[in-house]
Amino acid sequence: MTFLDALPDSDEEFRQLAQTWLHDNVVGKFAELKGRGGPGDEDIGFDIRVAWEKALGHAGWIGLGWPTQFGGRGASVSKQMIWAQEYTLAQAPARVNHMGEHLLGPTLIEYGTPEQCTRFLPGILSGDERWCQGYSEPNAGSDLANVQTKAQLDGDEWIINGQKVWTSLAHVSQWCFVVVRTEQDSKRHKGLTFLLVPMDQSGVEVRPIVQITGGGEFNETFFTNARTGIDMVVGTPGNGWSVAMGLLGLERGISTLAQQIGFERELDNVIALARSNSAIMRPVIRQRVVQSWIGMQLMKWNALRSMSGGVPGPEASISKLFWGTWHRGLGELTMDVLGVESTVMPDSEYSLEQKLFLFTRADTIYGGSNEVQRNILGERVLGLPKEPT
């Protein structure tokens, strides 16, 4: 029996429930990670954050919005928003399985077989199994349709060869969902398949990529005759593009809700910093702080609108375009609030504020660049002609 076996009907009762649980549980070693684990700081206290993930799962806080028949809580959009708000206010530890809960889980619910759901959803809900995403390649980043990693059937197994890059948390994940090319003469979107691949095997090599912040969240992942079962295809062979795009819609659609947990914390820290060093007294800084706060509120409203409409479609690109630009701007604002201190490394590593600035330089690129998002919106939402090639 979990803490959340029965959700209260009232949003206010639910808020009180969330507040009470977070107050009682963000203590001890978990309280030591308050405000940590954000951009450029992902390696901090990882073992503690894994334990926190399991605590969330044991109490029933993972999969709040999943349908009850799949082990979720069937929580309304408003309750999911309340949980995000209270999580932020409690400064609870940063999550380690966003990929599993918010991306793969809903994708399996939408496209997976009953056997796949039975096998994988409980591990996500309990916090016991972590997932990473194998999409980008050296020559297939924003142009994802150029995937070159291949998989061939060998009896009842797929044999996978190729390379993925920018694989977040691959070094600490047990499974990876991978887009591969299974029809060898196919081009672009055709002939792709969505596979679930175990990471703990000799055919998978993970090499960390040291970022400009000094952190190592991202990795190169090499598949050399790696294997996975024939039953590990999500959807059907050759139709992986549709599954991958459905997942990207979830990523870009829920990101303004899930990521706002960290965003609000960062904005609060910037405001506190501006007050403490009197930067808030400068009219330009004060105006930019207000603009950032307004942007945060707009992202919340857009998240509610996106989630209330069911599975996000191409309009989810609005979310990615919005938060990528907003977050990069927050990093720039942080440096201006710091002033000349922003150019000096205080110790052997960058400060959290400097890490935020350095990390957010990539926000308008990864997960689909701003240029790609504008093309999607122009072509699929506004009906404009495709960009000439």
Language model segments and positions:
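Glycine-rich phosphate/cofactor-binding loops in nucleotide/flavin-utilizing enzymes
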Residues: 3-4, 78, 82-83, 94, ...
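A short, Trp-centered hydrophobic/proline-enriched beta-strand micro-motif
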Residues: 127-135
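Amphipathic, small/basic residue-rich leader segments at the start of a protein or domain
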Residues: 1-98, 119-126, 269, 276, ...
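C-terminal helix-coil-helix/basic helical segment that borders enzyme active sites and/or dimer interfaces
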Residues: 30-40, 275, 279-286, 297-348
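Glycine-rich beta->alpha junctions and the first turn(s) of the following alpha-helix
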Residues: 3-7, 13-14, 204-301, 363
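N-terminal glycine-rich flavin-associated loop
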Residues: 96-115, 141
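A structural signal for short hydrophobic beta-strand segments in well-ordered beta-sheet cores
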Residues: 149-152
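A short core secondary-structure module
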Residues: 156-157, 161-207
